[in-house]
């Protein structure tokens, strides 16, 4: 894990925080970069100390278990999602909807959805939405976030396609957010990073297994397997 002061923190409305009445939701694409990295995805903080919510995940067998918590109180929603299904296309959708009028919160991740009713919510909410490190929350997992949209009476769309700096603008170019220690993924599209390598004295081939997210490299007497989720390499000799 990286040092605490080097971990990413993204405050969505750092420069201009809107106020929502009756309803708002946020949705974004998320990708996991490690099946061994767990932690907090984001926090949503209201003006009232009792109205702070966070989204946490860890791994339970073949599932990713997401938990929406009301800080200092309880787990509101526990939502298991198939790890294989969610990670099949790299990105999967996450949506959290706050119905302020009906006092209920809905969590939808990939193709799974749950509703928690009876959550006392203010009819008007000025949310401080923070991804990653936030106050005492320092367990920042290895994830990526893309295409963030906050829906209310007005829709705020953040492509998150910046290439450098700490400023985050909406799709119209208006400054709203600030991010500390960002890693902008657009740069990785141009600057490739070597993950590993294989060599063989005899003729060799390779193929990719999409279901297992593995690359196979083989020659006449050996098979090497590189797992793209864990980075582990295993080898097997043919007999």
Question: What do the predicted segments below correspond to?
Answer:
Residues 68-93:
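Short, aromatic/His-centered strand-loop micro-motif at the edge of beta-sheets
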Residues 1-15, 147-193:
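Extracytoplasmic low-complexity segments
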Residues 199-208, 239:
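Repeated scaffold domains used in trafficking and secretory/extracellular systems
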Residues 211-213:
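Short coil/turn segments that connect the beta-strands within blades of beta-propeller domains
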Residues 89-100, 105-107:
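Short tryptophan-centered beta-strand motifs in secreted/extracellular beta-sheet-rich domains
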Residues 116-144:
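Flexible glycan-contacting loops in extracellular carbohydrate-active proteins
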Residues 42-70:
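Glycan-recognition/cleft segments
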């Amino acid at each position: 894990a990286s040092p605490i002061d080097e971990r990413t923190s993204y405050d969505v409305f750092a420069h201009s925080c809107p106020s929502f009445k009756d309803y708002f939701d946020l949705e974004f694409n998320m990708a996991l970069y490690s099946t061994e990295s767990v932690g907090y995805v984001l926090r949503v903080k209201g003006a009232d100390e009792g109205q702070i919510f966070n989204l946490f995940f860890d791994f339970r067998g073949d599932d990713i278990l997401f938990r929406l918590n009301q800080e200092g109180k309880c787990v509101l929603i526990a939502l298991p999602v198939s790890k294989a299904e969610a990670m099949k296309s790299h990105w999967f959708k996450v949506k959290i909807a706050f119905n302020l009028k009906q006092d209920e919160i809905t969590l939808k991740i990939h193709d799974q959805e749950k509703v928690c009713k009876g959550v006392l919510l203010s009819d008007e909410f000025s949310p401080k939405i923070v991804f990653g490190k936030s106050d005492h929350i320092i367990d920042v997992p290895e994830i990526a976030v893309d295409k963030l949209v906050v829906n209310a009476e007005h829709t705020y769309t953040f492509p998150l396609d910046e290439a450098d700096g700490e400023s985050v603008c909406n799709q119209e170019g208006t400054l709203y957010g600030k991010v500390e220690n960002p890693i902008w993924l657009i740069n990785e599209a141009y600057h490739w990073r070597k993950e590993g390598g294989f060599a063989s004295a005899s003729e060799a081939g390779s193929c990719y297994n999409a279901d297992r997210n593995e690359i196979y490299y083989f020659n006449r007497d050996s098979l090497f397997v590189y797992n793209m989720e864990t980075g582990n390499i295993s080898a097997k000799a043919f007999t």
